[in-house]
Amino acid sequence: MKLEIFKNLQINLLSGLFIFLFFAKCANKEVKNLPKVIKDGMVMIPSGDFLMGSSDEQARDDESPVHPVHVNAFWMDKTEVTNFQFKKFIDATGYITTAERKPDWEELKKELPPNTPKPNDSLLKAASLVFEATDGPVNLNDYGVWWQWKSKVSWRYPKGKGSSIENKMDHPVVHISWYDSQAYAAWAEKRLPTEAEWEWAASGGVNKKYPWGDEAVTNGEPKANAWEGSFPYKNTLKDQFFYTAPVGSFKPNPFGLFDMAGNVWEWCSDWYDYTYYESFESQRGNNPQGPEAPYDPYQPYLRQKVMRGGSFLCNDAYCSGYRVASRMKSSPDTGLQHTGFRLVKSIESPSK
């Protein structure tokens, strides 16, 4: 909802030396050819050390400084949560998603700049954000050109009136807010991954740009469900999908996880802080849980949660969200057509 009200969507010498020494220590410890332990649709992700963030030519400012992180072992869903799985949750609990509820203006205005006028009642309705391709080239900094706030849109009706998830039960569920994913996680007795867990899992234990390696997404056979062609008006459909794809349609990463790039953005548990990585500039992060509070200098009144992995809309011209280190954020009460989630479980230490 807030995305519609406002227009969206150096490492110093000492820290650089610290990073170099850490990398030299762990670069030869890439996790390769591990046996894939799978249980109840989840893959065991081993503990490991890696360099979180990026400094390459496509990296955004919030991806730096690159810093060393250790993550304990955990279980992670092999795929994104599907419509079939989410329907089981709805049938069992009667839960009503954010997109199916009318926004509460009194709560909404607390996270907007002071004196923001109340929007027209036509906006204060049960709705979600839907992608609409444009007729031609547009300003890629103006996300509102291709995102439309529409009523009667939800996980059941991903494109609104006349659409359905019939014959798409193996597609990732979408129009899911962060709060919705939390409700599902509680029911499933799992949790959302931390941002660090997510990036380690996406890397597959190897130091590569993408979950599949370093080859550009546009080279060779399709590697993920992303936007091929000219965004947001011409998709060549090289990967055969305009919107979501059935989970597992592309090759898994070295850990055996599917769709860690493209298809849908995935919620993480962390608040989004634009400057969060700076707190690890000269020290290792040990199972970081994210910042205590959100911070975005460009949207200072908005409380946002981290999303990872990119979506079917990602294209190098403006997004490249399918890079392992790429970060995105959104309001936790906002549903979007390109956003879903997957869950994790902690591995309990054996009793002594």
Where are these regions (language model features)?
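C-terminal, low-complexity/hydrophilic appendages and adjacent surface loops
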Residues: 59-64
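Short capping motifs at secondary-structure boundaries
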Residues: 74, 89-98, 188
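GGW-centered surface loops in extracellular recognition modules
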Residues: 36-44
